[in-house]
Amino acid sequence: MKEFLNNLNYGISAHEVSNEFKQILRELLANNIIKEHKNRYYLNNGYVFGTLDISSKGTGFLQCFDESFKKDLLIENKNLKGANYKDIVAAKLLPLKKKRPSANVVLVLKRANETSLVITKRYGEAVLGMNIKTGLSTALKASQKSLKALPLGTILKIENQDNNIIEVLGHIDDESVDEKISLALFNKNNEFSDACIKEALANGDSVDASMYENRLDLRTLPFCTIDPIHAKDFDDAIYFDTEKRELYVAIADVSEYVYAYSAIDKEARSRGFSIYFPHIAIPMLPRPLSENICSLKPHLDRLAYCFKITLDLDCKVVKEELFETIINSKRRFNYDEVDEILIQNPDLKELSWLYKLFEITKNLRKMRLKNAFEFRTEELRMNLDENLSLKSTVFEKDTPSHNLIEDCMLLANKAAAKLIDVGVFRNHSSADMKKIDRLLNELLELGIDVKLKPNLPELIRDIQALADELGLRAEVDKLIIKAQKKAEYSSVNAGHFGLGFDKYSHFTSPIRRYSDLILHRLLKAKQKKDEKLFNYLLLNIQNTCENLSVLEREADKVAYDFMDRKFARWAAKNIGKKFKALVVQNDGICIAKLDDEIKGADIILYDTRVNLLESVEVQILEADIIMAKIYAKITQRLRKESNV
């Protein structure tokens, strides 16, 4: 469709329009979006086509197909005309009154999703559905008698085409409904089809080693897994031979169980990624695979795709070998346990290799960061009680164990990327210099005066050094990340700017990332010199990569939406109370992040005259549980950054 719509910019004749687009052509004519001239159809001035993105606040952003528009067009909630997330729409440009170009939706050309979520509300004598994403009300295809039989506040899934009710998800007062809402808003599903479950169960729950005589048997090696404390899907296990200086990175061999174009594969492709909520994971693969036969559980034989990476005394890679193996992990660690071992008990004989590996990865990290960036990012961990109410939050920082695993995985991912010239790469482009220039202006207001220089890694390190002096490193790192482009998947290698790698891919998480599963299949086909299979696996690979980049962002949005809902429920119980917060956005809408006993919640401030990264005290005035928004006013300015 994108190609058809773009052709209207230059004119397209009637016979060039396929049957697929003739109805759309008629609708465009009826709405005066296009005109006919000498048997050719042209887009009228002032109209654009694009894909709609909608923020958590209900504001629309149109990603224009016309590449001359360098920035997304702002579409206010009232101008969405019923359009939803990822819909392809025709929009009319509005007179430029603000800095950001804006438009309003004229016609929805293609629905991205067949369904929407609404909550029942009374409007006068009638019960209507209010769209949870946009806040717009709509009449439902059901009798008022049946709608009034439902308690107000019932969450319904409806068809976008005719507003027919498909499913009752629950009631807004029930906190367990949040998970269903977050998944349904982005068209995600927790359940697997009967065909997927049947395929998964057919693999059994144990590995018979006698069936895999051609695999390298590494079961005697003392592999271990290191994961979060509540993890069930163990993708990777490691072992380091201290005498031979050989690092083994064993990855769950999912491709042995999930064949291309099988029912599970089609479902995994559509999901793209596992989604992680604080209380549960929504897996990419059925649980009999993700949490059982594929998971590298301790003391069980498991199939693994394993890199053996040999390092010299200077910690440089001298050899990389890839094998189909069978392993038996000897121990399952969580990160906290390994941190304690590395810091307090480095002399444990049975784990001496782990401590020596840690010393090596510290050197690897030091060498890598000469050409890469190190950001002090903090992952928000939310703890819920038995009723799924917010109990506490904590920001988890990188620890020695996290760094150890990260650098081992980077070695394997980098090694895998070297083996292919086309396939699945993880690319990260150099930063947009306009965004960097804007960042420098923002930092100047904080007292961080850094002059623009052509060497971007050097520039960022200068910024970080000054941020360290001001005690603002973590906050400034987030601004730097925001100014950079997002990493994406592509069939063609373009390097990874942030990591400083010429070539990079994702190999180490096939249980939770579809990109890694594709790469495993490609590598196996290449090792077997099966060119026919390799090319077969490459069919539509660029489209697949582009779709995976979209699915990755969606998976993040689902997780963030769920947390926003829990924060909003917490705020509703704390109306009128005061908390510390940090201003993280002050361009147009002013937003602060809660920085008190509860951390990380986005607070929309009614006050706009406030400095970026200023610490303030806020009083919660309103919590919208339906739209997952919190509103507050500033009661005290605790610190101005210019005085830091």
List the model feature ranges, each with a label.
Residues 9, 157, 181-182, 195-644:
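Electropositive polyanion-binding surfaces
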